[in-house]
Amino acid sequence: MDNMLPSPGYNIPSIGTPIHHQEDESIQTQQQQQTPRHPASFGMNLPHLQHANISQTQDNHMMSPAIQRQHEGSMSIYGPGTPAPATPHTPASVADPGIIPVLENIVSTVNLGCRLDLKKIALQARNAEYNPKRFAAVIMRIREPRTTALIFSSGKMVCTGAKSEEDSRLAARKYARIVQKLGFSAKFLDFKIQNMVGSCDVKFPIRLEGLVLTHGQFSSYEPELFPGLIYRMVKPRIVLLIFVSGKVVLTGAKVRQEIYDAFENIYPILKGFKK
């Protein structure tokens, strides 16, 4: 076995490595020239990384502005001259102005399920008035929630003035309880919200003349009769009253979300007619 070992001055070539040492050295030299300056992928120590970053930063400062812009464009992962995509913080449109309409009034109806003697109710109940020559219903008010009820002899009742859906239902139940205490077999049937009214302020004046000319199919504006522009939105089916001052009233909704959707639709239009 000792006779098979090579002499100390002889190097055994590795498998697959050519014996031509000059060509091997030239290939290694080309590979070293093609390797990047940043040794981050090779697991180098942190001081070498910092030194490489500092030297590259100094090289960038020494470049001319035109060469530096070209260099930065070539380093972008999207290619030179390609802008970076918009981040989630970049506003895409004016669809989110940060203005939320406030509910001002909710109108609901309920069926008490019995015939009512309106004179008896008006005489015995508090905060109730009845004038059949003017209006064929008892007008009753309570303080909490601050609402007004119209009570008809057929047993139908309309509740107005609530600021939320919960307050409207609570007020209607209180009115039904008052009628029960007066000796009527009143029930609480078919409660339904019929109309919701909201309002908001866009905080800028609006050119109503230009708006009615552009959107004449959906709007009408007669300042001699009414100072606001009436805009009838198709979807959602909402009527908007738009004033020069920037105040907007939204009515005709059955649910709260319709108010919000209608304002999101109209705000970009109003933005286009800002004075």
UniProtKB/Swiss-Prot annotation:
Sequence repeats lie at residues 103-179, 193-270. Pfam families: TBP. Residues 23-45, 73-92 are annotated as: Disordered. Gene3D superfamilies: TATA-Binding Protein. It is found in: Nucleus. InterPro entries: TBP, TBP_CS, TBP_dom_sf, TBP_eukaryotic. GO terms for molecular function: DNA binding. Keywords: DNA-binding, Nucleus, Repeat, Transcription. It comes from the Eukaryota. GO terms for cellular component: nucleus. GO terms for biological process: DNA-templated transcription initiation. The keyword Repeat applies. General transcription factor that functions at the core of the DNA-binding multiprotein factor TFIID. Binding of TFIID to the TATA box is the initial transcriptional step of the pre-initiation complex (PIC), playing a role in the activation of eukaryotic genes transcribed by RNA polymerase II. Belongs to the TBP family. Belongs to the TFIID complex together with the TBP-associated factors (TAFs). Binds DNA as monomer. This is TATA-box-binding protein.
